[in-house]
Amino acid sequence: MTDLIRQGALFLMSEKCYDNYFLYHNFLDVPCFKALLSKGLGLAIIAGSVLVKVPQVLKILNSKSGEGINIVGVVLDLLAISFHLSYNFMHGYPFSAWGDSTFLAIQTVTIAVLVLFFNGRKAQSGLFLVGYVVLMYVLNSGLTPMSVLFTIQSCNIPILLVGKLSQAYTNYQAGSTGQLSAATVIMMFAGSVARIFTSIQETGDFMIILTFIASTFANSVILGQLIYYWNKPAGVKVKDSKAKKPKTKKDD
């Protein structure tokens, strides 16, 4: 039983931290506390990521519509997630630092396929899925040099910003967040904030840290829109602009 507890604890902390906590009872060790907190947050984010975009998927399936969802934004978001996943996986970073990207990628590609399908592009939705599977094989099988993966990861910030902000622009034009799921938006924002801390602790990779800072900013914009447009039906912005249109002589 003691061995099982030890093995479980060592999954969350280093042997040095285990000794500090369980042998010397030094519970005020700051570096060990930070490492344990980071590992715990990372695992919590991974657990949450299993379902983070499921509300969005269900909302599309129930309405049989991708209204208000910018497909370009979804595809760019998918690329950013996939490049991040591959970069971390091939670098050999701890799974707790990037494991959520695996589940986010699966759910995001599902959203992209559903939006294409319900927009009447059924053949394209199938081709898109096949193309994505091929891309992931190329990125994660060792066929892609590490130098290329680093370059791709460095491009993640503009890809991520363009993808998220194009969705924000779509929301602005529509005067509504359409079929965007509030639960998904909130969890994505919270996850990106937590990932800044876990990335500092577990990888120290400046490129990854900067990526999550950019992600937090972009997610905060969409979260702000969600709050602003909460009780506003689609088309309010357009109607308001028409209502303010000055009268012409014909109207008189």
From Swiss-Prot:
Q: What positions does the domain PQ-loop occupy? A: 34-100, 157-211
Asked if the Swiss-Prot or TrEMBL record annotates the protein with the keyword Membrane, the reply is: yes
The way it spans or sits in the membrane comes to: Multi-pass membrane protein
Name the chain's protein: Mannose-P-dolichol utilization defect 1 protein homolog
What residues form the membrane-spanning segments?
Answer: 41-61, 69-89, 98-118, 126-146, 148-168, 180-200, 207-227
Q: Which GO terms describe its biological process?
A: oligosaccharide biosynthetic process
Which keywords does UniProt give here? Answer: Membrane, Repeat, Transmembrane, Transmembrane helix, Transport
Q: Where in the cell is it found?
A: Membrane
Similarity comment text for this entry: Belongs to the MPDU1 (TC 2.A.43.3) family.
Q: Does the keyword Repeat apply?
A: yes
Quote the cellular component terms of the Gene Ontology held in the record.
Answer: membrane
SMART domains documented for this protein? CTNS
